[in-house]
Amino acid sequence: MPRPVGINHVAVEVGSIDDALRFFEEIFGEVELRGRSGSMAFIDLGDQFIALSAGRSQPADEARHIGLVVDGREETLARAKAAGARMLDDNDFVDPWGNHWQVVDYRDIQFTKTPRILEGMGLAGLEKSDRAIAELRTKGLAD
C-alpha cells in the first residue's frame, strides 16, 4: 500500500507574479527561484517550493491556510505586516491576494529537513526545541 511521504509544493494564486515576488522579498529579502514563466514563479525552499500562479479571481479565504515554516517567526510576522499583510492573530496573516498564511518556527515543529538540505539553504545549525524533539521521539523519529 503506498504512503504519502510529504508535500513537494503548494500552489498559491496571486494577482501578478511581479507584485507577489516583491511582497515576499519585502518579507524574506531576495528569494531564490526554481523557475519563472509569464504566469508562474517557483520560490525555492530547499527540497520543496511554493508555486505562485498569476490571476487569482476568487475572494479571500481565511478558512484554509498554508503553514509556512521559518527560522524567525516574530521577524517574519513583523515584516509581513510592514509589507502590507493583514494580521489575523499572533501567528497568521492574509497576503494582498487573500491567501491565509500561518507562520511557525522551525525549531518548534516536528517537520525536519536533513542537515545537508539545511546547509544548502544557508541554515546549517538550525536547531529543534526540546518540545519538538520530544514529539519526534514519541514517534520513534528522534534519539
Question: What is each residue range found by the language model?
Answer:
Residues 51, 74-76, 111:
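Residue-level signal for secondary-structure boundary sites
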Residues 7-15, 41-44, 57-143, ...:
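Vicinal oxygen chelate
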Residues 55-59, 107-109:
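A short, sequence-level motif marking secondary-structure junctions
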Residues 2-5, 11-50:
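Core segments of cupin and vicinal oxygen chelate
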Residues 51-53, 102:
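Conserved beta-strand in the GNAT
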